[in-house]
Amino acid sequence: MARSAATWDPGQYLRFGSQRLRPALDLLAQIPLDAPGRVVDLGCGAGNVTAILRGRFPAAEIVGVDGSDTMLARARATAPECRFEQADFFGWEPRDRPDLIYSNAALQWVDGHPTLFPRLLSFLAPGGVLAVQMPAMHATPLHQVSRELAASGEWSGELRDVIPLPGILPAMDYWDMLRPRVASLEMWQTTYMHALQGEDAVMEWASGSGLRPYLDRLSEARKAAFRQAYAEAVRVHYPRRADGTTILPFHRLFMVARMAGERAIA
């Protein structure tokens, strides 16, 4: 089942744009296609990676798909030569079979992966590629602290109905799900040591992503109070170093699945 979309703030999300971009580039570097004709950026957000896909595949028709009208407005300005569609992941269907469905840090926002991933594979052209990167942070303090805080006495009345992020499946579940359906499958995990600058940097990072479902339920004054409470609680897990930097170890799961059939392989 698709989950309700959080309200997105492109400026807050892109505050750590360089750190968020690196995994997207690492995924792109492993795509085994020379010249795909149709490319979909699924969960394109503000369009920063969509523009990079345009540079990588200049002859392709590139379509960005996202559920947030705020993000899509930013994306259309960022990559005006690309086409954009508003849709949720379970409702979207391509007009024509894409050669590449690329999804960076997006599919973790929904559950139902045993249905969603085979569905995405079914859309691909022969020899097409599904390339996915998802954070694997559900069991870390980055998300545990927000869940615990929301369930505590001060906040439970306002936040009791917020459904936490579902967390992705174990890596081997994706292998077992995808491998029988594809000609080849590459999977790997990486831990990025994101070096964040500024006061309460982890809180600022989370405010652009994982805290959004909670912040959406609160008034402006209560948002500020929740952000401060989260900052104080998470600080012990991610302390500032002697040079003022905060290190956020961030685990990410990558997969590149290629369908059987003829495509231009690098």
Where is each model-derived feature located?
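Conserved class I S-adenosyl-L-methionine
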Residues: 1-37, 48-52, 71-74
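Short glycine-centered segments of the SAM/dcSAM-binding site in methyltransferase folds
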Residues: 38, 128-129
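Class I SAM-dependent methyltransferase SAM/SAH-binding core
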Residues: 38-94, 115
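Conserved Class I S-adenosyl-L-methionine
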Residues: 46-48, 162, 166-266
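A conserved beta-strand element that flanks and buttresses the S-adenosyl-L-methionine
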Residues: 102
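Short catalytic micro-motifs in class I SAM-dependent methyltransferases
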Residues: 105-106
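Helix-to-beta-strand junctions that scaffold the AdoMet/dcAdoMet cofactor pocket
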Residues: 110-111, 124-126
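Conserved catalytic/acceptor-binding region of the Class I
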Residues: 114, 121, 129-197
